[in-house]
Regions:
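Intrinsically disordered, Ser/Thr/Pro/Gly-rich linkers and terminal tails that flank
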Residues: 1-173, 180-190
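Glycine- and Gly-Pro-enriched alpha-helical subdomains that act as flexible
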Residues: 171-192, 197, 201-215
Length: 215
């Protein structure tokens, strides 16, 4: 026999060791496993969805959201609600690719890149600290703006003290509702008209309302 036929036979024998047919049965499970791993991996996106509301004229855990002392206060039969946004995918609240994909398909959610919300590499501790700082600044600015308004309308606010209590809510966007709630407490004007009114917006110490994100 010639050399070429022997090489062909040897090649066929080697080929049997590497029969690709068994891989056909493994390809499906391998692809499925890879897909699952991708879906459960942390996402590089932030998911924003509607969050809970809080009545600034009411209480949270037994404490008045807006506690005013040193002046006469009044009750409002209605509610002034501050609205919030639930954010997943921020430091300390990871979101998977699967969750981001489902949110992308939902008309009630917004999906945006993480770098548009917080600096890359920011820790959960620093994120929470910054968010709480924004909330504290928002409350202080709202109190200052409300006092300026009340004083301009003839109310004596020299002895007025204000403290605000709210749990698990950060950011600056509740300032407008805090200011309205404080003014309503002191004037007794029933700003709600006995109804339930929801609102949002930042507010600086001079009473200027600013834009907010996420809603």
């Amino acid at each position: 026999q010639g050399l070429l036929p022997r090489i062909r036979r040897r090649w066929r024998q080697v080929g049997r060791w590497f029969d690709v047919r068994p891989w056909r049965y493994l390809a499906g499970p391998i692809v499925a496993v890879l897909c699952v791993l991708v879906l459960i991996a942390p996402s590089a996106y932030v998911v924003q969805e509607p969050g809970p509301t809080q009545d600034v004229l009411g209480k949270v855990e037994g404490k008045q959201v807006i506690d005013v002392s040193g002046v006469k206060t009044h009750k409002d039969s209605g509610k002034l609600l501050l609205v919030t946004v639930n954010a997943s995918g921020v430091p300390g609240y990871p979101v998977t690719n699967a969750q981001a994909l489902l949110a992308w398909a939902s008309p009630k959610a917004t999906v945006i890149p993480q770098e548009a919300v917080f600096p890359v590499g920011q820790s959960a501790k620093d994120y929470a600290k910054e968010s709480n700082k924004e909330m504290s600044s928002s409350q202080n600015a709202a109190a200052t703006a409300a006092k300026r308004f009340l004083k301009a309308h003839g109310y004596d606010v020299s002895g007025m003290k204000v403290s605000m209590h709210v749990d698990d809510i950060g950011g600056p966007s509740a300032g407008r509702m805090y200011a309205l709630g404080l003014i309503d407490n002191v004037t007794g004007e029933q700003l709600s008209g006995g109804k339930t009114i929801a609102g949002t917006g930042t507010m600086n110490a001079k009473g200027k309302v600013g834009a907010i994100g996420g809603i």
